[in-house]
């Protein structure tokens, strides 16, 4: 098990070659929701590789609106390829988060990631492979109609985003998300290769895989069980849930000894009202 890296925020800022966007400081912990199969794939691999996804793989048209925009009118700017890791800054909206990310029957895990360890690993990769890194807080200020019209000079936000356009401004527009999603409290870490050929061997299907220490993961939280009752079907479902949790917990600890693995207690304290 690797040693925990202890470093002050000021030392972190001075040692890292990355720019902050929409924020003035780093946060201690990031939360990442992933399916159990993907978490185990990360942990059980000989080299632990974290996925940074090209926005070309994103589904929301409002998040990709500015991905393939022609910016040549802005001093001939041509956008570079970028790769992004998305995570949340807190777990205050836990119930909504589990519902958003839980798809089908596959178990879901929330990883608590020590930000310092993650950023140091990213910084090392970036320096070795000639990449720029941006640590960005997602900007939720704009409503749907304001994002639709943002590219127009008449928009009150036009100068903020499109004057002196460069890679940093490009990352800023790629950090936009509609106001309706403000509850997500998302952060994004963007990697921008200065020499795309230097990262080719780490690319697959528009995803950039970067080596990271699994010690950066301080806690694994298993998705909550569904609200239960006294029915036989509910008891069977709870037994299946407990068996899945036990199996996945054993696999995590085998790959990451002494890992902290817990069930979410989201619904555990709810009691059924039988009579009013």
Please give the residue ranges for each predicted region.
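Partner-binding and oligomerization surfaces adjacent to conserved cores of proteins
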Residues: 1-276
